């Protein structure tokens, strides 16, 4: 899962003025999809699935009380699942788009709100998402989402900057508390794995990749050791499961054989050994099925 927080500069995500440029850019694949008869994904927010670009621009541009001319007015969060993660989100475009909206609403934006340490929930954030299916320059199908987030909360009273580093202190200059991006990325990854059942390899985790990029030599070595240990434990667990799966058919076959033998035994005729004396036979009779002394054995079948 690749999640980025963008905004600033003079390019597509320039954010000190109107968000018109961003909303226009985020509609770039709509016309092509309509030409091909494919469904277009509209903007959405926490409670609505269909929002026009005009409304998005109006709401973001007018939610900037007490922001100066050069202050950021909004940010853009990009959520890009890998191909394997997409498979866990659904089999069709429609299923995956619905899963992405749920993930953005229930997890990404909730973790975003919590990241400021101000007791906020996703309902307090002014945001609008847009789902895309193809990245520029990519030939293959590749779904991802862009989320325009206002610098101010929905009440237009609190400044929220995800670019302000978290220090653990209550007051950090003009912005209280800052934003813990590392914790945000980690929580988004964990909640995705939990809600989709995705079995993430240790080398694919945010902590591992972040350490490989930014960690010290000692931290990198320790993280590699951790990944090797986790992979070894997973392999041993898989071996145990394979061994159990191989044994179960033989155990089942043995139980069936025992059951069959039990059924056969229950059908064996019972021999009634109670002798009956035949007074009209001679003592030394040698007729078949008869014993000397006038005793004859009868077999009774149940």
Task: State what each model feature region is.
Residues 1-302:
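N-terminal nicking endonuclease/strand-transfer module with a His-rich metal-binding environment
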């Amino acid at each position: 899962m690749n999640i980025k927080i963008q905004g600033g500069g003079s390019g597509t995500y320039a954010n000190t003025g109107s968000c018109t440029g961003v909303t226009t850019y985020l509609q770039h694949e709509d016309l092509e999809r309509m030409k091909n008869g494919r469904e277009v994904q509209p903007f959405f927010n926490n409670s609505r699935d269909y929002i026009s670009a005009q409304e998005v621009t109006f709401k973001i541009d007018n939610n900037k009380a007490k922001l100066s001319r050069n202050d950021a007015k909004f940010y853009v969060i990009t959520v890009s699942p890998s191909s394997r993660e997409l498979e866990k989100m659904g089999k069709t475009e429609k299923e995956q788009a619905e899963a992405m909206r749920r993930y953005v609403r229930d997890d990404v934006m909730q973790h975003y709100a919590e990241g400021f340490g101000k007791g906020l929930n996703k309902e307090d954030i002014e945001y609008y998402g847009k789902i895309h299916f193809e990245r520029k320059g990519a030939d293959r199908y590749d779904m991802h989402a862009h989320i325009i987030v206002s610098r101010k909360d929905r009440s237009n009273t609190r400044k929220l900057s995800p670019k302000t580093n978290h220090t653990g202190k209550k007051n950090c200059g003009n912005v209280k508390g800052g934003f813990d991006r590392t914790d945000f990325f980690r929580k988004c990854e964990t909640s995705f794995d939990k809600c989709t059942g995705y079995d993430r390899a240790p080398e694919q985790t945010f902590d591992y990749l972040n350490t490989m990029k930014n960690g010290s030599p000692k931290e990198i070595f320790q993280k590699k050791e951790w990944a090797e240990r986790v992979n070894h434990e997973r392999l041993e667990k898989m071996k145990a499961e394979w061994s159990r799966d191989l044994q179960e058919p033989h155990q089942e076959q043995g139980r069936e054989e025992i059951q069959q033998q039990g059924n056969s035994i229950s059908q064996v005729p019972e021999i009634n050994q109670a002798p009956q004396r035949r007074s009209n036979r001679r003592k030394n009779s040698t007729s078949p099925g008869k014993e000397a002394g006038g005793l004859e054995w009868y077999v009774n079948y149940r």
